[in-house]
Amino acid sequence: MINFDYRCLTGEVITKEDFEYEEERKAWNRAIEKYPLVIVYCKTEDDIRNAIIFAKNNSLSIRIRSGRHHYEGYSTGNDIVVIDVSKMNKIYIDEKNETVKVQGGTRNRELYKAVGKKGYPFPGGGCPSVGVVAFTLGGGWGYSSRLLGLGCDRLVEAELID
């Protein structure tokens, strides 16, 4: 077994040796049993960059996780680096331009609450625990799609981290 040096990782780092690993590795679909090498809960873009660099330097695959809500478990895997952005869930509402900016970990329930307070609709899905970014990148079909269009129809801009 290879010993990895996790000291270059920032954010909250969970490895197989940590007490909370067993609970933190689980997906929404409890039938998915995957065992990632490390889970990095990112709070900043630098945390994400450091996790990507760690994975690249160690020839490890990565998965991005925001809500753990995927039927097939694509946000996790065996012996990989899980970059979890669920703690990056800030929402910025620009009423002048009628736009909303969300961080990668924002979930439907958080966005519905924020825009609902301002009287705005969001063409999100019916499950509150689904991540908004994953929902949108998957096309974004929801109960209000006939009225508001798909979630991806409302995407104005995306920022990627390399």
Which residues are covered by each model-predicted region?
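Active-site and channel-lining beta-strand-loop segments
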Residues: 91, 150-162
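N-terminal accessory segments
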Residues: 1-148
